Regions:
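N-terminal low-complexity, acidic/polar interaction/targeting segments
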Residues: 1-190
């Protein structure tokens, strides 16, 4: 693990994103337009999982993302596609005068244990169906390594409409097997 040498901007959102996950964000508030400007010229930014019922200080981790695409929506609003390169532990948060938050972070390991591929084919094929039936999701991912068990389980966790507090239990380094069992039980009704 390495520490990030500078402060990174923090964007609090109810978005759960694991390494290699991609999502599209619509940016319209001036302070977050400034965040995007800073992030695009530096090291990216942190998406801080922020449910409506939580405060910034309750969550001590985030998704460190790079901006991989800029676009303008049909309504003229800036749209950015971001990809998570790593989870990070948030060591401290500072607030600037423009109400932007910045954090000192260090990278956090995620699912480094050996992965079991026994249930992969069923989860992979059902995920491939989701991509085929969702044009926007399908276009976000140029590569879909559905042969990679941790990638498949991570994408399912991001997509499933379950409570963020439950998803939060799967961010720890050794939580892969629990995550796989959870996704398998929901998707395949086991």
């Amino acid at each position: 693990m390495k520490a990030v040498n500078s402060r990174l901007p923090i964007f609090p959102l109810p978005v759960f994103l694991l390494p290699n996950g991609i999502t599209r964000l619509r940016i319209f508030e001036p302070r977050y337009l400034k965040l995007v400007k800073i992030a695009s010229t530096e090291q990216g930014f942190i998406i801080l999982l922020n449910a409506k019922s939580s405060s910034l200080t309750e969550i001590k981790w985030g998704s460190w993302v790079d901006i991989i695409n800029f676009d303008e929506g049909e309504d003229g609003v800036l749209e950015i596609d971001v990809q998570c390169k790593s989870l990070v532990e948030i060591l401290s948060i500072e607030n600037e005068k423009e109400q932007l938050n910045f954090g000192c972070v260090k990278e956090k390991s995620h699912w480094s244990q050996k992965v079991n591929h026994i249930k992969l084919s069923e989860l992979s094929s059902s995920l491939e169906d989701v991509f085929k039936n969702n044009i926007m999701l399908n276009t976000l991912y140029n590569e879909k390594p559905t042969h990679n068990a941790s990638w498949v389980v991570a994408r399912w966790l991001e997509l499933l409409p379950i409570n963020l507090a439950i998803k939060n239990t799967f961010i720890n380094d050794h939580s892969y097997q629990d995550a796989e069992n959870f996704v398998h039980a929901i998707i395949l009704n086991d």
